[in-house]
Amino acid sequence: MGTVYDLQTAKRWLAGTFLYVRLGRNPEHYSLAGDVAGRSLDERIEQICQRDINLLQDTQLLSSENRLKSTEFGNAMARYYVTFDTMRILLSLPPRAKLSEIVCHVSLVEAVYLLSQLSVLVQADEFREVRFRSGEKTLYKTLNSANGMKFPIQIDIAQSAQKRSIIIQAELGGVEFPADEQSGKHKRQYQQDKAILFNHIHRLIRCVIDCQIHLQDGPATRHALELARSLGARVWDNSPLQMKQVPSLGPVAVRKLVTASVNSLEALEATEAHRINMILSKQHGFGEHILSLLKSFPKLRVSVKSMGNVS
């Protein structure tokens, strides 16, 4: 908004907040690093502003060539309402240059990018309430060993970020919740935690995408977009489970279709109605209904035209 453009305007803005009133009335309730006894209220306000300006500059969220100005990273942080601590985590994603030196197989490169982006997302401050609770670890070890886990955790499961990763991967991989009685005790908490994760994660991955576009990191942008599509559909991109997006098709129906070599939405749309009925053991009319639903799915195409010689 341009309201704050130097230290003095920052102090003026902060002086109009409730924090200023509280600092004046109860300064002992607000301990500041490096604070000195006897400092005036104005000096303490200046210390707060200077500290935060330095933090924003160190994290590349603020530039100060002539006057304080938000960078593209700072704009993304404001656009998607991302906390400062989370923004620092999102900006810690490694560029491709460092990964390509040690990884050469294309499919492995893609896996590393997806895993690194997912690993960064689950550390977000917005998810601090999603943590391990008493007796939950056995459940998450069971989920982690399921076939649908794209990136199973290979070390001991003990950190909250690992729990979050397992919940997201279980959702995207179509992993069914264990049916045993002990796991059932944690199902309600599992559903609540999943709701928290998916309530925030869409804007966080959009923030990652905008940052990677600004960095002109093509591979990281592509993989972030792939992860965003997966999170939006709640299934891994390019997975047969994409067919779950069609109403009336659940995990069991998808498994039957895959067994019959129908592995994608495109393949399903190319399948005749009577064969869909036969594969899914449905009555006449079900296949026609599925095909009519598929017609409403968007089909995106990109075309490229050469405009002249490229030197």
Map each language-model feature to its residues:
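C-terminal helicase module of SF1/SF2 nucleic-acid helicases/translocases
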Residues: M1-E28, D35, D58-L61
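C-terminal helical accessory/scaffold domains
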Residues: M1-G2, K11, A37, L41-I45, ...
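Short coil/turn segments at secondary-structure boundaries
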Residues: R25-H29, Y81, V258-T259, E269-T271
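Short linear loop/turn motifs
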Residues: E28-G34, L68-S70, T271-E272
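Helix-hairpin-helix
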Residues: F73, W236-I290
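A structural signal for beta-rich interaction modules in eukaryotic proteins
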Residues: G285-S311
